[in-house]
Amino acid sequence: MVVSVISKIGKGLNVSSLTSKSFIERLIQEDYKFFTGVPCSLLSGLIYELEDQKWEARYVPSVREDAAVGLCVGAYLAGTMPVLLMQNSGLGYCLNAFTSLNLIYKIPALVIMSWRGKAGKDAPEHIIMGDIDRELLKTAGMEYSVLSEENCEKVLKKAKQKICDEKLPYTLIVEKGLFDERH
């Protein structure tokens, strides 16, 4: 069971969020043992926890999203189930790697992608990708779910089943405020 916390945001508004620590523990229970990715403030709590290196999993930072896809492929071929952490703005960088490597050769990975620019609320450079990221995933034939505290267990089960049965990447889209952020 993923544990939640109440965090204060803005002017005393309480928003429930998953703890990064409990979510990583849950992924490790599901046998995800290799993590890589490119930093994003919405995923900063996850990255902070992974950098602590107290886990029975390995975290290797990546310089670009397409390079992270390559690291995930290597980890999978070496026998480890990989997780890629990235901002949705990096989807354009890594689509070619996914379509010419993972999708053709059936190499799975769990992708945790932040949803910057959702509903036009973010810095201007994130708004276009925030509007089209899900359509890009669909067009590429990559399944996804929008992760929430309420559907976490169900979505993790679905992702694991798709990854194991179909040997394809599966994306969890993460909205701002779902995980604790650290700066």
Which role fits each region the language model picked out?
Residues 2-183:
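Thiamine diphosphate
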